[in-house]
Amino acid sequence: VLFRSVVWAGGTHRRTDGQVQRYAPQDVRFEVLRQWRSPHSGASYPVAMAVVLGKAADTMRLELKPLMDDQELDARASTGNYYWEGAVRSSAANATDASRKLLQGRGYLELTGYWRAQKL
């Protein structure tokens, strides 16, 4: 589970052996790979991204790519906003050791606050 907001970033990773790795804000970096502009709201979402986790000696790079771009929800009647949530494909590798096995997976990505500033 990873989170990023204007003021905070961090996350946890549960390994296959059950151990939990916690990531402090300085250990999580998000890189936009591709933007998608909604024809419905006009909002631009970073639907494809790389998440770099960890310190230099043991860094994991996780790439997230949507199964389809248009997964925007019109939630103006409930939350007052449009937001993007949907299915993604993932691939992960050790960023400092290319010989390590590439991992493939599926996931869920939620992107809020891209249509207009949210009132908290």
Predicted feature locations:
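Structured soluble/peripheral alpha/beta segments that form catalytic or ligand/cofactor-binding pockets
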Residues: 1-120
